């Protein structure tokens, strides 16, 4: 079962619980994106803020450095487009598969770290001026179909997740965001056909 769809099913059948209490992890992808970007720039992961991974935990996801900062300064123009397109985006998206191919098993430690940091920031709050990626039922922001469990940038003050809103989205970003939304919609439709959202 697709993890985002597990979240969707729970949300569907527990309608009396607020939507923002249902999340699916994108933190493993978020952490991988930060790690790759930090290596490329030759800086510590802790120097980076505002990484975003839009969409699904799948090869259609969109790791996005548009808003990334290094020590508070814009970093997007520090990456060449070919590296982003040919290495960064596909390698972050396909990292899990690469690990399984090499090791014959998933990276349980990385997944556990993702779970720990997801829960820590949910309950203790995200650092001021930073955000993390969380998959939660869409409220329609950024043209993402409402109700679709989709990774978006979020902050937390310790009481729950708040979506980062009103970010400027380019046509190129929108196209990649649409592709991963369509992937999630096809997964949701498959779940519907199984009668799990009836």
Which positions does each model-derived feature cover?
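C-terminal substrate-binding/catalytic lobe of Rossmann-fold NAD(P)-dependent dehydrogenases
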Residues: 13-23, 28-198
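Conserved small/polar residues in nucleotide/adenosyl-binding loops
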Residues: 1-2
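Short Gly/Thr/Asp-enriched flexible loops that form oxyanion-binding sites at enzyme active sites
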Residues: 6-14
